[in-house]
């Protein structure tokens, strides 16, 4: 409603890879793949997408929807997996990894600065679609993703490597600890790549910088 008053040139609706639900091996969802959320969080994000589309159709708000894979970065919430891993490694504690032997969940990761770069690229290089009355159409939409797919164990191993410490871990049943937690999500970034966007900083360099920042600022993960 506030956007209707101020009339922005573009309204970015941030969403998640979770709205499409779990993927099969090798599958990558495109921008308008079916919405099949598995848990209440993903359903709430899908609802936000639906509301933004309704405002685009009803009021011609300049909506652009973005769906993003797992973000990480300096000053990330302490409750997020990469921070939990580093905190436990620093304290020489066991890191719980969701999954079983040979069946550990995976995620695509992207640094938050790369996401910001993608958003600025979209704003500079695209123009929001306008709704045409009585036409079955939809707003513009982009997946912001990477090619950096790691299992939770692989991510923990990289963090331990960059810390120069040993990783102690145990596999735990994710269905009992996190109901509705999907094994894998995956988005295709082909649409944005065709426009010319590329990640400015690699995953390994980004993660190494984040780990070092948290080692230099231990109060953040205590």
Model-derived segments and spans:
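Conserved Rossmann-fold NAD(P)-dependent oxidoreductase catalytic core, especially the SDR/UDP-sugar
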Residues: 1-39
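Flexible, glycine-rich beta-alpha linker
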Residues: 19-21, 36-40, 64-83
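Active-site loop of short-chain dehydrogenase/reductase
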Residues: 3-11, 61-62, 94, 136-139
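Structural signature of the Rossmann-like NAD(P)-dependent dehydrogenase/reductase core
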Residues: 10-15, 64-70, 108, 143-144
């Amino acid at each position: 409603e506030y956007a209707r008053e101020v009339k922005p040139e573009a309204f970015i609706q941030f969403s998640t890879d979770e709205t499409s639900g779990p993927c099969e091996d090798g599958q990558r969802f495109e921008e308008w793949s079916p919405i099949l959320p598995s848990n209440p969080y993903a359903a709430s994000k899908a609802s936000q997408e639906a509301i933004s589309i309704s405002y685009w159709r009803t009021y011609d708000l300049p909506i652009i929807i973005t769906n993003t894979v797992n973000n990480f970065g300096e000053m990330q919430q302490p409750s997020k997996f990469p921070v939990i891993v580093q905190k436990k490694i620093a304290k020489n504690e066991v890191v719980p990894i969701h999954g079983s032997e040979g069946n550990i969940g995976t995620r695509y990761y992207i640094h938050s600065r790369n996401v910001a770069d993608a958003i600025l690229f979209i704003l500079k290089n695209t123009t929001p679609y306008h709704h045409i009355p009585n036409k079955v159409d939809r707003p513009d939409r982009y997946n912001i993703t990477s090619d950096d797919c790691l299992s939770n164990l692989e991510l923990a191993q990289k963090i331990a490597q960059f810390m120069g410490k040993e990783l102690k871990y145990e596999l735990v049943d994710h269905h009992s600890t996190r109901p509705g937690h999907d094994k894998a999500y995956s988005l295709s970034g082909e649409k944005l790549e065709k426009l010319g966007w590329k990640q400015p900083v690699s995953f390994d360099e980004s993660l190494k910088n984040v780990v070092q920042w948290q080692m230099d600022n231990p109060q953040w993960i205590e």
